Amino acid sequence: MPPPRRKNNGPIVALVLFGTVLLGVGTIGIIAATRSDRVSDAGYAGYSSASPTYTYSATTTTTTDTTAPSATTASKSTSTTPSKPPGPQAVYKLGDHPLFRGDLGTFDVNGCALPKMDYSPAGEDRFLQAALPCIEAMWKPVFQRTELPYQPVELQVFTGTTQTPCGSRQNNATAMYCRGVIYWPGGFYANEAGMPPHPGKYLGQLGHEYGHHIQWLSGMLKAADNAQYDAGGWDTRTGLELNRRKELQATCFGGMTLAPLSHGAIPLDVVNEGLSDASNRGDGSRTPDHGSTENNGRWVMHGHKTNRTNACNTWMANAADVA
């Protein structure tokens, strides 16, 4: 169910999108310049051997042909039986993904000890690394309940330029997620135009990036990439809409991440600042690949208030709700 709109725009038309087995393509990040043009991340969605997967082992049975003057033995053809080891497997679906069953929400944590914020790259790294175990504790049980694969996210705070499997990245742009790793530009958010630094901003953006990790682990990120490939690329009209659905879902998951923290784990003003920051990001006049500022605000608050994964099913939302 999408978040309530400020105005009544009629009934919602469901859009169900399914992934294929084709190779996915990554999306290109937009560097924010003004408050209305700020985007939350690059939204890269590439896959690698680090993605949840399994290997097949072959069991082969053969017989040898033998020929004698008095008899001939018929040969049996070689057979290979693939076997999938037990354990959680990613599900490459979108609107009907098992993560959207109705009883799933992030779990409360007994406090989250965060250091005093120091806006140097080293200080940002200490703060974010301290927050991650709290976020992992909220989300890991969700994956266990749905029998989906789980692994902790990695975080790299960098200065200058860094190389990633999704391409190079400079620290004059927003954070980027790629294949199990959050690449965080040291110093960028402390000097972002239009908004002074605040610890809540960092938690809000970390929640969004972790939202991409949820998509990657579950298989939705690959399914979305496949759907964009089928649509002719991420920069087609349909491809951009798919990208907005993906990014707004990460924003909604980010709102869910902030929900347990608002139950006394950290000061409430830090949570509120994280929600406010996410509510003031969007495409503005730039490439429409992350969603409007209004829709970013609606989805982050919807995720925060409901704390249910099915509330973040942007794949089933009306097109107006993901504009």
Question: What are the residue ranges of the model-derived segments?
Answer:
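Active-site recognition of the HExxH zinc-binding catalytic motif
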Residues: 139, 204-219, 250-251
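Auxiliary, metal-adjacent structural segments of Zn-dependent hydrolase domains
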Residues: 126-179, 244
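Pan-zinc metallopeptidase signature
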Residues: 279-323
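Short helix/loop segments within enzyme catalytic domains
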Residues: 244-281
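Post-HEXXH active-site segment of zinc metalloproteases
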Residues: 218-243
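Acidic/histidine-rich, surface-exposed loop or edge segments in extracytoplasmic proteins
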Residues: 106-125
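Active-site scaffold of zinc-dependent metalloenzymes
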Residues: 165-200, 216
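Hydrophobic single-pass membrane-targeting/anchoring helices
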Residues: 2-101
